[in-house]
Amino acid sequence: VGSEMCIRDRPKHVITVIDEAYLEFVTDENCYSMLKLIKEGIDKPLVIMKTFSKIYGMAGLRVGYAITDPVMADHFGKSSNAWNVSFIGQKTAAAATLDQEHVSMVKNINAQERDKVTKVLRSLNCKVYDSQTNFILFKAPIDNMKVYAKLEEQDVLIGAPIGMNRVSLGKPEMNEKFIKIMKEILS
């Protein structure tokens, strides 16, 4: 509701761009797409960006899209390259949209893994920030660079520690390896 109010209350000359790359991972019912504002015909420029890189697992194909009103879409059409997405990317993305059962499965597995990893990190006295995505931001009770280095020694790569660590969730067996190493590091 807060985000929606900010969009509605902004001046008409301000273009709002919302990146909903991770929205498909969200399980919190209070989080929702701003697409409804475009459907309602909001009288302010709004662009919603989506990607096939996250829940669809198609990062290598570099496929995404924007949803906006007809006036903004016309501006995009005049300034974009007609060949900015490969044929394979287009066909694969189109096919992926038809398999919502797979998207639902990925979302459910991600939520289970996110909850499991979060609980373990908290049990190891890490400060864990609530997440609705496929990654977890945490601060270990020891130097984050040490955590990063110890994980790297065992071929587990996480986001570079700039005050905190960021671990992307993977397949359950990859997450188990991360948990096992974290227990060794912090025990």
Per-range role (PLM):
Residues S3, V14-L35:
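Conserved PLP phosphate-binding loop immediately N-terminal to the Schiff-base lysine helix
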Residues N110-A111, V120-Q154, L169:
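Conserved PLP-binding catalytic core of the aspartate aminotransferase-like
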